[in-house]
Amino acid sequence: MSGWYLFSVWLHILAATVWIGSMIFLGVAVVPLLRRPEFAPVRTAMLYQLGLRFRWIGWTVLLLLVITGIVNIGYRGYGWDDLFSGALWQGPWGRTLAWKLVLVLLVMGISAVHDFYLGPRTMQLLERGEASAEQLRRVASYLGRLMTLLSLAILALAVLL
């Protein structure tokens, strides 16, 4: 096995750990802590700032996952021709990879909506004191949970590869 391949796999796993670990930490540690009454005055601003901070980290690791994923597939002997001819998707390994990539694209799409539309829009509405902000906040929270679950499903598929 090539040292570069092993490094790429290691980097891929590290990026996945940062992505999933950060979402789980936010959901099981940060959000429950901020729900305590003494944090009510700073809750919204704190979550928004954490979201902004995580956004660049999250998109960096997602980009790293895509790049290392492509490199890892290349090291397994597949090229762009295999991708477009359908050869990459043959057999159990290829079908598992296909499902993993579908979920990755779904997570990236949901993350884009969450990070670049819902989060900023919710803050605008909250700053204006509009009642619809709470509904958008709930949708953003739901999407965050959905991304976590989909990311865990991606991890399960990765183990099968």
Model-assigned labels for residue ranges:
Residues 1-161:
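Polytopic transmembrane helical bundles with strong interfacial aromatic enrichment
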